[in-house]
Amino acid sequence: MKELFNILLINGPNLNLLGHREPKIYGNTTLSQLTHALTKEATTFNIHLHHIQSNSESTLINKIHNSKNNINYIIINAGAFSHTSIALRDALIGINIPFIEVHISNIYTRENFRSHSWLSDISSGVICGLGLDGYFWALRTAIKRIKKISTLQV
């Protein structure tokens, strides 16, 4: 029987508005459509994709804390919290689970305040500016890294 691995997908503030908010920047696909497609892709690799979206920093921090013993990898689009939340940074450092930071838009070509992320330097990697495709690249990379680690531990 193949081992089942778990990836946590975290979406921060305003990402619940995907498909409706600034479609020229974020596209027309809803968060529900995106997570459905990602879940389907993950399942083909025997990965269980867990998802949370919250506009509340404390909810995201609690979810991160509760992931310590059952999540193998995290994919996070912290939205605006990327630029403001040292608390999210500390939560991710505290659980020591590798993560990939994703941004739909290229944060380096937008307003100056968006060009700094408190998460980037502690992440395994950052994907930005690739639209929703960035989530799929992050998922594939996380799966590849999980599988590599699991074969090394056998």
UniProtKB/Swiss-Prot annotation:
It comes from Buchnera aphidicola subsp. Baizongia pistaciae (strain Bp). It is an enzyme of class 4 (lyase). The record marks 21 as: Transition state stabilizer. Homododecamer. Belongs to the type-II 3-dehydroquinase family. This is 3-dehydroquinate dehydratase. Keywords: Amino-acid biosynthesis, Aromatic amino acid biosynthesis, Lyase. Transmembrane segments: none annotated. Its EC number is 4.2.1.10. GO terms for molecular function: 3-dehydroquinate dehydratase activity.
